[in-house]
UniProtKB/Swiss-Prot annotation:
Coiled coil region boundaries: none
Metal-binding in keyword set: yes
High-level lineage: Bacteria, Pseudomonadati, Pseudomonadota, Gammaproteobacteria, Enterobacterales
Name assigned to this protein: Probable glycerol dehydratase-reactivating factor small subunit
Disulfide bridge partners, by residue number: none
Binding site for Mg(2+): 31
Family: Belongs to the DdrB/PduH family.
Keyword field: Chaperone, Magnesium, Metal-binding
Physiological role: Small subunit of the glycerol dehydratase-reactivating factor (GDR), which reactivates suicidally inhibited adenosylcobalamin-dependent glycerol dehydratase.
Subunit composition and interactions: Member of the GDR complex, probably composed of DhaF(2)/DhaG(2).
Cofactor section: Mg(2+)
InterPro entries: B12-dep_deHydtase_bsu, Dehydtase/Dehydtase_re, Diol/glycerol_deHydtase_re_ssu
Length: 117
């Protein structure tokens, strides 16, 4: 049993440390009232693998992964290992990145996802 406070975990490659990309993902979660715990993790360079690790380590079972090349994966711990709920990329822009974060919060709250434009 984990004693950490509940929140969506975001596992990211060290390249993104201190960047606006991390801020936008976390701000999207905050807009939904769901805490975000961002954790640097260079163990994998696959966004889905990072997202799966994040989801499995979160008491809420929801995780985001951000790899070195800018791929983003939103997933749930109960999904198959090779499946993400939503994928995106940092090149999509700040609004879309924030929406991915918001969608992670909406997953926790069992709300429909916002459309990524």
């Amino acid at each position: 049993m984990s004693l950490s406070s509940p929140g969506v975990h975001l596992f990211y490659h060290s390249r993104w440390q201190g960047t606006r990309v991390l801020d936008e993902l976390c701000w999207g979660l905050e807009e939904q009232g769901v805490p975000c715990r961002a954790i640097c993790c260079d163990d994998h360079d696959c966004a889905l693998a990072l997202g799966k690790l994040a989801a499995k380590s979160s008491t809420l079972r929801v995780g985001l992964g951000l790899n070195a090349t800018g791929d983003i994966a939103l997933t749930h711990a109960q999904l198959p290992e090779d499946r993400a709920l939503v994928c995106g990329h940092t090149r999509a822009g700040t609004a879309q990145i924030r929406t991915l974060g918001a969608n992670a919060g909406q997953l926790v709250k069992v709300l429909p996802f916002s459309e990524i434009k």
